[in-house]
Amino acid sequence: MKSEGESGPFQGILRDIEGRRKCYKQDWIRGIKTGIRILAPTCYIFFASSLPVVAFGEQLSKHTGGALSAVETLASTSICGIIHAIFGGQPLLIVGVAEPTIIMYTYLYSFCISRPDIGRELYLAWVAWVCVWTSVLLILLSIFNAGTIITRFTRIAGELFGMLIAVLFLQEAIKGLISEFHAPEIKNQETGKSHFLLIYANGLLAVIFSLGLLITALKSRRAKSWKYGFGWLRSFIGDYGVPLMVLLWTALSYTVPSEVLPSVPRRLFCPLPWEPASLYHWTVVKDMGKVPIMYILAAFIPGVMIAGLYFFDHSVASQMAQQKEFNLKNPSAYHYDIFLLGIITLICGLLGLPPSNGVLPQAPMHTKSLAVLNRQLIRKKMVKKAKECMKMKASKSEIYGRMQSVFIEMETSPPQDNSVATDLKELKEVVMRPDEGGDTKGKFDPDVHIEANLPVRVNEQRVSNLLQSVLVGLTLLAVTVIKMIPSSVLWGYFAYMAIDSLPGNQFWERLLLLFIPPSRLFKVLEGVHASFVELVPYRVIVTFTLFQLVYFLLCYGMTWIPMAGIFFPALFFLLISIREHLLPKLFDMQHLQVLDASDYEEIVAAPIQHSSFAYRKLGSSHHLSEGEDEFYDAEILDEMTTSRGEIRIRTISFKEVHPEPEEKHVTFEPH
């Protein structure tokens, strides 16, 4: 993130507006020109966004006594998404109601019902004042260029925050599952044993449905790497497997014998959008004047915490959506997007809706889906042009020149300096490689070498974000369908979100490392492993991990304190000072830079090749179909990213490439 020219107020916002103004028109033209193919990433990100929002709505309804529900979370996600798609700086960023918002709104509800002069009646009105303060603070942060501060949040903060959210997801799943054995909604005219059996049956069915959803969702999430099935089928299951599993287990819930009451299993509580319970929040602004002045001023305190939380969460999501490995050509807009977030928060507060902000992993998932789309389009045109030139027996320089012209034509923004030459450097070397007699192994093959050497390109546009936000809004018309989902299926979905977010979190990987006996540590080196395993002594890894664990327990413990829990975001800002001043005194700077690196770097035990490339290199006469080509793009990018959407940077183990025993690189210490 650059800071040049941002010394004065408004400088960052003005620079962002100027940068995005130049490409705003093209953002729409590129999306429209993509045609019907834009529906694939649109549907993909729609399901990835809508399911968590429905789950958060159920959680919010449970913790706020029904004051807010899935209707409000869906409405907020849709309205904020449409505003951001049209007016936002970075259109690849996906916004939605997230878990931190649910946590803070739960604390605010607990505070309100404990105060007779506010109570449940003025809960949304007081929260609206909290949103007003939050909005003011976010706008001030953007005006004074606070966006540059986000670079001071290192991996340690992001992974602690991610682990906290994962544990809170798991906690919610466990609490929800236990509540199924005490469901008050399940009533029977008979008492005693019959009533107990119905409650018990509901609980057992909840265990089956939640575990079933959890296991099948985790399995389908990895479908792209399955050995079985056609590429298009594996790709479809990998992209849409989770919503399909929700549909499957919902359908299975209707196979319960008719002798059991209709209230078993328990299903989602969600008022219809046109019912009074859902209509009240649209007019909450008229009740804001009823809030006592003392509480209006007191709303500043949670406003500070929520502003800090949104600033951190929104900026990190934006960073992940535009990682350098995606090779985005359009400029970022961190300051302006924080300013717009302040406006969105104000609108949501006045409408009685929980605000939306940038979400993970949906934001980088959106970018990745558009990278697959654009890579398919570019490769097909380049392969076609190369084959045409080869039929005409054109020279190698002419073949490369024609392919370069296609690449420039398909670029999402005008090329700058020597960017195209740099991006196509490896492909040029392959094309211009001299033939060695009758050896055909080094001969240029468009089907093989273009795929292997084509850089990642993203279709940077606004249409997919706008369409998926509109679809989320249309989901409100399907509330009667949403109410058919068993609540236990959502508890399984919460557990899925928790477990699926752990791979790629180095804090989690180091925690697992603590349970491996020193005599078995060599097993870690036999597979893909994080770079710190070979570069940092084992005792340093243990010490650093224990520090993170203690700090994590402190953050998690604070969420259990009824009133003080609202201050848990302050611990993440305190971590900036700890990282800059305390940790360098406790750890060697080289070790600290590896353990707290900005990139997710992995080391493989031996040189690897992508299976599709190796298959073709063996000279097989079986060519992959068009559908298979498209799938391999998706599989490659899927393997390149962690569960939170972070790009993996893989390097070859020095020990494998240079097996001479003159230097020991593995630094595990048994004691």
From Swiss-Prot:
Domain of life: Eukaryota
GO MF annotations, alphabetized: solute:inorganic anion antiporter activity
Role description: Probable boron transporter. Boron is essential for maintaining the integrity of plants cell walls.
Chief place where the protein resides: membrane
InterPro entries: HCO3_transpt-like_TM_dom, HCO3_transpt_euk
Lineage, highest ranks first: Eukaryota, Viridiplantae, Streptophyta, Embryophyta, Tracheophyta
Extracellular side: 59-77, 145-157, 217-235, 313-332, 491-557
Keywords: Anion exchange, Ion transport, Membrane, Transmembrane, Transmembrane helix, Transport
Family the entry assigns: Belongs to the anion exchanger (TC 2.A.31.3) family.
Membrane topology type: Multi-pass membrane protein
The keyword Ion transport appears for this protein: yes
Pfam annotation, one family: HCO3_cotransp
Compartment list: Membrane
Cytoplasmic topological intervals: 1-37, 99-123, 179-195, 257-291, 354-469, 579-671
Sequence intervals crossing the membrane: 38-58, 78-98, 124-144, 158-178, 196-216, 236-256, 292-312, 333-353, 470-490, 558-578
Listed PANTHER family: ANION EXCHANGE PROTEIN (PTHR11453), BORON TRANSPORTER 6-RELATED (PTHR11453:SF124)
Protein name, entry field: Probable boron transporter 6
Gene that this polypeptide is encoded by: BOR6
GO cellular component, one term: membrane
One GO BP: monoatomic anion transport
Gene3D superfamilies reported for this sequence: Helical hairpin bin
